[in-house]
């Protein structure tokens, strides 16, 4: 049986953790080497890229930006900064026009400092913040630099105090924190009502497929796999490519440097066979040559 290799783009359903989705894919394919590209909270739906087999080694090279569509609820604060948590306060809804709300959103665009939610995956003294928060601990989490490239107001419903937004942001951005901080700036409090991720690591909503059903007890993995996988190079369209001759491919599989070709101005280069099969990633050595960094089908 050929080892599966590639990316599955899952439309994560509400109610499941990202880890639970990975565990189901492991069971379905019968392999352990499976990882996801960016945690989604259980209540959040949408694009969850899952790397299968040696494609897990490519995750650090994928673009980290993500895009979300969500609803922010003004007038309510919770201990988790979303409506999944316990309500901490209720305040009268602000009388805002769409133009005034746009002004309130302006400070959150660009490079900003953001404090993660108390219930988050941030490490505090070697432990996840959410574990300490659920024990009732209050933590002074430091602010972190993040970038919100685009923040669009899609709809504003003043009667309900809900605004629908689209956010294109850097890795490490918390939309729950955005909702909390917007409400704080407006003086009424706020939290996240719902959220869907529409783009992650270069994968789009249109590519996402439903999470496969849980395999029956005793079921065995299939060949080919019962899960469609995108070729690994599809996730690396932002990187230059180099095709190797049969002789160069032999050197590559043994971990040897590839002799100079065209100059590559990039931190990494996708290496392909003559037929277009991905062989791994190389690092330019400054002379036009490539040093192997990630080698699929390595020998010796």
Swiss-Prot record:
Responsible for synthesis of pseudouridine from uracil-55 in the psi GC loop of transfer RNAs. SUPFAM superfamilies: Pseudouridine synthase. InterPro entries: PsdUridine_synth_cat_dom_sf (IPR020103), PsdUridine_synth_N (IPR002501), tRNA_psdUridine_synth_TruB (IPR014780), tRNA_sdUridine_synth_fam1_C (IPR015240), TruB_C (IPR032819). One of its GO terms (biological process) is tRNA pseudouridine synthesis. Its EC number is 5.4.99.25. HAMAP family: TruB_bact. GO terms for molecular function: RNA binding; tRNA pseudouridine(55) synthase activity. Pfam families: TruB-C_2, TruB_C_2, TruB_N. Keywords: Isomerase, tRNA processing. The gene is truB. This is tRNA pseudouridine synthase B.
């Amino acid at each position: 049986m050929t080892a599966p290799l590639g990316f599955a783009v899952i439309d994560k359903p509400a109610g499941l953790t990202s880890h639970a989705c990975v565990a189901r894919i492991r069971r379905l394919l019968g392999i352990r080497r499976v990882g996801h590209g960016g945690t989604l909270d259980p209540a959040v739906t949408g694009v969850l890229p899952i790397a299968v087999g040696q494609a897990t080694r490519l995750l650090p090279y994928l673009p980290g930006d993500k895009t979300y569509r969500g609803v922010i609820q003004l007038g309510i604060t919770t201990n988790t900064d979303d409506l999944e948590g316990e309500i901490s306060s209720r305040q009268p809804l602000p009388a805002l026009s769409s133009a005034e709300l746009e002004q309130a959103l302006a400070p959150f665009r660009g490079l900003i400092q953001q404090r993660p939610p108390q219930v988050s995956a941030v490490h505090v003294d070697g432990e996840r913040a959410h574990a300490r928060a659920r024990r009732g601990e209050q933590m002074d989490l430091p602010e972190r630099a993040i970038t919100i490239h685009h923040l669009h107001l899609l709809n504003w419903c003043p009667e309900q105090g809900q605004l629908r937004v689209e956010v294109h942001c850097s890795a490490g951005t918390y939309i729950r924190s955005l909702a909390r901080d917007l409400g704080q700036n407006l003086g009424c409090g706020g939290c996240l009502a719902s959220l869907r991720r529409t783009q992650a690591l270069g994968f789009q909503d249109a590519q996402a497929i439903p999470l496969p059903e849980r395999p029956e007890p005793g079921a065995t993995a299939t060949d080919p796999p019962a899960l469609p996988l995108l070729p690994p190079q599809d996730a690396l369209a932002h990187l230059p490519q180099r095709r190797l001759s049969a002789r160069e491919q032999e050197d590559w599989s043994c971990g040897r440097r590839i002799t100079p070709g065209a100059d590559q101005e990039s931190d990494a280069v996708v290496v392909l066979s003559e037929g277009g099969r991905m062989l791994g990633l190389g690092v330019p050595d400054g002379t036009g040559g490539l040093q192997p960094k990630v080698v699929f089908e390595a020998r010796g």
